[in-house]
Amino acid sequence: MSWLRSSPLRQSGNGGGGGVSTGHSSTGSLRQRPIDAATDCDPRACYDSFCKHWQQAYDIIQHYAPPTHDDVLGVVSHLDYMVTLLLVELHHCNKVSLPSTDASAAPAAPCLEYLLSENLLDKLYEWACTTGRYANAVRLEQLKLYELLVSHSRHQLLCHEPFLRPLLKILASSQGEIFPPDLEKRLVILLNQLCVVLMQNVHLLDLFFFSAQTQVQEQIQNGNVPPPKSGTTTNFIIFSLLIPYVHREGSLGHQARDALLLCMALSQKNSNIGTYIAQYSSICPLLVTGLGGLYSRLPNSIEISSIDWHRITPDDVTEIPELTLFMNALEFCNAVVQVAHEMIKQQLLDFMYQGFIVPVLGPAVLQTLKGKHFQTNIDSQISAMSYLDLILRSITEPGLLRAFVKFLLDTEKFDGERILDSLVERLNSPDANLCMVTMALFDTLLGLHCEDLMLELLLKFMLPGKHVPISHRHKINKIDPYLNSSDFFLELSPDVLKRARDLARPKSVHEQQAPSGATGEQPIQPLAWPSLPSPVMSKTIGANWNYYGLHTGDSLYANLQAYLFEAHWRIAQCQRDCLKWANSYRYQKWPRHGQARVHAHALELARQFFSEFGGGPPAIASESAGEKQLDSLQSIGESSGYESFKWRPADEESDATDLTVTTTTASEADLEHNSSSVSSGMGGGGGAAAGRRGEVWRISHTNRNELLLTDLDFSEDLFAQGTVSLGPFLNAIWGKLQTFTSNSLYVNLHLTGLITRLAWYPLPLIHSLLLRSDIAITSDTPSFHQVLRILKQQIDAELPVTEDSLEIIDVARSSLIDREFRLVNARKGNENSPLHHHQQPQTTLSQQQQQQQGQQRSAYATLSAATPVQATQTSAYDPFKRSDNKRKSISKSISSMFSRRSTPNPPSSAASSGLSQIYAFFTGAASTLVGNNNNNSGSGGQSQPFSSTGTGTCETSLSTNPQSGAAAARSTGTATTANGNSSNSNISIGGSTQTLSGHSNTTTYSSSTLHGLDGGPQTGSFNSEPASLDSVASMGIIASTSGTERTRDVALCAVLLDEWLKELAAIAQEQSVVLVTDQLL
């Protein structure tokens, strides 16, 4: 314990802590302790010395005159010696020794026996009450003595009345008093130790709960202490003394909150304590009002220093003192709800909702004041939503999470306006920062796997099934289309990316023997899922593809095995959480036997429809099994659904399913299907979920009888196609997706991550929208697959398969991989600060020093000076080797732009052909760089880094929670957020350790700091590339290369879309595996 190490009682050469008073610290030198606690001494001599010191102190105590300064100093000095002797004795008593057979042997602790038998502590307390202005100094020494005895004797002394009675007296007299800081610290430490002892010995709890009441009444009768200010004699004195320190800063507040949590945990074991805290203490209102006050102190606008900032990270919390205090209070409330008695928990949740969430957090998110909207800027909206996102990511207790879910869906507290609807509207914001923060918040909400939230966002618009034509509804539970969907997503890859893969993939023996002319007439189609892994090469190091873990570089880019691993893990996690839902939203088969009334009702509805609109009943039985009678109405999808009116043959009946909502209760689902999953349509585990307090917030309590729908409302299905709405949430997401090529890179990263998170849900209804390309969608907006087709056509039109397009794609791909490495280096810098935190001075180094530092670079060094390489299949080149003079530039057209130099510049010649050219190519800085080369000759003949004139904007990680392989593999990734419970880790896939780029502790680095992480030289060359492409573009360099800004943006979108399609293909395949597994169980 830190307090014991720093205690003056353990230091033989120092005076007592605090002396008699703060004004007499110079007298501490008079109180030298000649022996240490661990010193071997004669027990008899120690006992004699102890009695002698007490006798001398008692002589001073017996003086009738008011104590003087010398009297108090003398008593304190003797008391200090007595404490030291007690330490020596307790040290020897705690040693393991054989029991003595001598009946006449002395007691094991004679000094302690004397202390208790003579009531020394009681006498000392009575004298301390008469010391007047020296009362605090004497009280401090008393607290030190009790602290020492409690820590060394554990619970044994608490059973002795000579020890317990004066302890209770001094605690009772401390109520309502204001003490100096040193005395407060000792008091909180003593209370903390008492809570630890009581937690380990619950049978002693009644001593402090009831004996305290008796002692207070006794002291009131004797006139020693005034009546307690609380107005009640029922008192848990330890808890009452800790309450004033609950919102204190620093170590004092932490120790007080730890002790209060122990008291809350004690309430679970003793119902009297729980009743007292809930009914007689003010802890719950105090916590909630303090939380609201701390929230009001938070900054109204957060300074955004990076271009891709989207949420508050733990580093941001530590850098903002007000936010640190607020998070400490919030985490304490979360812990109280977790460990406290049910009465305390419910009271705190009620106060939280009525006293903080609704009146404080609600207006802040809605930007309202007294019910009226006030003019605010974007920064205040961003900060309010960031705080809400941080709160949702920080709390873990189901009770609190359920309160926040209720807050998002409440329509009564905010004049009919729901918080969730306002958040959905902000998805359409033209401001990129607000849009990214909003999508990050929805990523957190979807990561909660809450049934009510999913019902309000998606499912209630999809449950009627109007978005799926009748003729396609029987396909929902089929398995094969999932595999076809994987091929569908891979085929949607832009043509220029397909061509790049064709050029990069080694040719087979058959292709090498084919004539050269046949190659151009019949291009090779890329394999969707290669049967055998093979190393794939391209003209740049950024195009080194990683199939199933076999890769030539350290990037996780295009690692299909990582995508499959990520999809499998995320789907399994989501499935486990959704198993606890009260209902399963699935397509349920019509029963084959029984329920003839249901069949008769369906046929009757069909006859009524045709008699009204068709003039007669349909000839259902007369049609042959192989014919399909089509309706004459205009069909928006593949069919109008007319053929679905007839009963399907037996071979189709097994797969034919119609949309209903399973309203089976949790207990029925648990009895009938114990091991089934949500993907197979079972709400299993409901009985366990009902008994698990920790998952109730995920379960919806909506009346499911209101959701019963009639699947055979044919007239509405046939005549309302094309007008079905998927809800404002999906409409906003689809709207952002339609402007994919116009969005910023970071908006697209969050957008793809949000859709990917939806695809993880094991719900066939969502799969019909996202993963099932064979199911037509009839809605008022283009379907997801239609939007993907439009994006492919748009990219193919703007990036035709030409040599220039392939070069731009290579540059875009390399830049995204370089971004991945920068994120990895930033994370490694956080985790391994001794190796990466030092920022080297930006001085000119000799060529030999540069080579030595280049050899010390880690495998995750940035790719700023790397150049394209012509690699064969057996090439074993190192993509991170910086001193390879055989490397070529990207192309002759690009190298020609940098070929004109007024003076030779050997140190920077290698650097001028790597990603520095890529950055220049992206930002159109060719002419500017050429012009600047002559101007930089004064600085050692090296050009100045971009970052010296650029902004301080740099990139941070897209996630505050750890991600699995594919999220880092895409680097361009999905902005996914895990449950807060996972930790940063490395996942070994395909025999290689893959460091994940998503992390929670993200530090923003400048360009020079990134190179300091790599251990590379800090020279004024192109090795000091800017932190991001956007920061280079922000310098205002006018584009002068062959590629326009629009072309470069489309190239980035094409590479991002290509990687995202691979991830969706992996998810579709893994979902099919889950569905097969569930059906076999």
Swiss-Prot record:
Residues 657-668, 840-856, 891-913, 933-953, 964-993 have a biased composition (Low complexity). Pfam families: DUF5917, KELAA, RAI16-like. The modification Phosphoserine is found at S508, S833. Residues 1-31, 504-524, 650-685, 830-913, 933-1027 are annotated as: Disordered. It comes from the Eukaryota. Residues 1-11, 857-876, 954-963, 994-1010 have a biased composition (Polar residues). Keywords: Phosphoprotein. Coiled coil: none annotated. Belongs to the FHIP family. PANTHER family: FHIP FAMILY PROTEIN CG3558 (PTHR21705:SF11), RAI16 PROTEIN-RELATED (PTHR21705). This is FHIP family protein GA25918.
